[in-house]
């Protein structure tokens, strides 16, 4: 911005989170520019409230969306034009910290000593820099790696109700990326409950992913826009977190895991902002720019020649209606879905991932290889046949089944138990040390079960184990006891 352009304006109207600001002639800031104003109700600091320009209302007036509470603002108050979009700190100084939408720390551990600040509005990587190779992202979790594998630089939708283990699965993924791959994780709490965000922070401390006594050794950043915050904050916090992840990918060349909980609330906040700006709503009351906003976020999540951002996004489905525009728009971008099922959790099989409902675009022999594909399809076939037989078993009992079907049921029950796995972050629940299972060991184990190599081993030996060698060892101990 040139030196001749005035940088000060004044508030002329406050309507909830919408603030109209008037500037002198020739000083109109661009759309997405961050403006600063002092709100004494928030803190004693100067310029403590950020406003983002959303519309030009005339030659000298802009309509802005506030990133925090506007209580305490009044007409005539001075507003400073920063001349740039919202800038957030990036780099290793952010590790181990809890930040808000504007990159300010909310963990009471002092300022973030970042060397660089990046704009949250960025273009996706150009085609020439994107990595076009389709590669599998190994998680070390058997059920995911075998049946619904993740794509490096892909987007995964995580569906799960309350209490089925969604948070534990997220934490295990964060732990595995940090410890097994030396990667970083960025967690975006979009419309998060404050309690859930607090719980996640303390659980990350317990697993040493965040080390408050040595922040440089931490391997995760938490960025929260809580559900009590204005829609402007909730609509932008995912972009703030993504910007921090992009730095680790593009500058440090790392494989980064980006968690967004919940992507529906990102859309919901955008809908609120759209209504506040007076736009005519589209289908089911959503903003007319729904697909554009979602695409702007999702297209930045990709692999480049330097590194990758793999995103796991929790998706709330309103009234279980998958045709609702919000989840339907998100589905178009997903490479894999991981569905957590309460009926599986009730069997005490954790992670409670549904092996038949979870999907992946890369479950294809051209990508994962013929052996992996063949074993995955064989396992799914056995589980599907078992599902079909369950009504007959419930009514008539096992004795009415043919010998072939009895064998299918026996193998399916072993597969079901072998899909369970002790997690590092869940040792307090299971009493067992966690297991990271390499992909080849996963394929080999399920191949042997499906082929009947372990038909003589009791079901109990398969429960909460890592590799098939551990199952054989369990069976030997059971036989000796």
Curated annotation (Swiss-Prot):
Q: Report residues binding ATP.
A: 160-167
For this protein, the record's InterPro entries field holds: AAA+_ATPase, ATP-synt_VA_C, ATP_synth_F1_bsu, ATPase_a/bsu_AS, ATPase_alpha/beta_chains, ATPase_F1/V1/A1_a/bsu_N, ATPase_F1/V1/A1_a/bsu_N_sf, ATPase_F1/V1/A1_a/bsu_nucl-bd
Question: Which keywords does this Swiss-Prot/TrEMBL entry list?
Answer: ATP synthesis, ATP-binding, Cell inner membrane, Cell membrane, CF(1), Hydrogen ion transport, Ion transport, Membrane, Nucleotide-binding, Translocase, Transport
UniProt cross-references to PROSITE patterns, sorted A to Z: ATPASE_ALPHA_BETA
Give EC number(s), comma-separated: 7.1.2.2
**A cellular-component GO term for this protein:** proton-transporting ATP synthase complex
State whether it acts alone or in a complex, and with which partners, per the record.
Answer: F-type ATPases have 2 components, CF(1) - the catalytic core - and CF(0) - the membrane proton channel. CF(1) has five subunits: alpha(3), beta(3), gamma(1), delta(1), epsilon(1). CF(0) has three main subunits: a(1), b(2) and c(9-12). The alpha and beta chains form an alternating ring which encloses part of the gamma chain. CF(1) is attached to CF(0) by a central stalk formed by the gamma and epsilon chains, while a peripheral stalk is formed by the delta and b chains.
Q: What does this protein do?
A: Produces ATP from ADP in the presence of a proton gradient across the membrane. The catalytic sites are hosted primarily by the beta subunits.
User: Which family is annotated?
Assistant: Belongs to the ATPase alpha/beta chains family.
State the name under which the record lists this protein: ATP synthase subunit beta
State the species of origin: Myxococcus xanthus (strain DK1622)
